[in-house]
């Protein structure tokens, strides 16, 4: 059985939107992520090497989002999902990107 890791309300500024006025200044987006992970080994060893390093994932997502420029939130979400799966070995991810 897998546990669920949650990262909620990660706020990052980026260029996003289809209208000219949206693309003139960075807007804040809020990102929620959840992904399955078996935490048994990490719980036994109490070692960061045996778990998902949330800080590293958050730093990577922040860097990606800050450096990106998308018209659609869907494109940004797909980019984040690909980054997290490909770079950090997460097998699947549930993601929400919103402009508060």
Predicted regions and their residues:
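N-terminal, polar/charged subdomain of small-to-medium soluble alpha/beta proteins
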Residues: 1-100
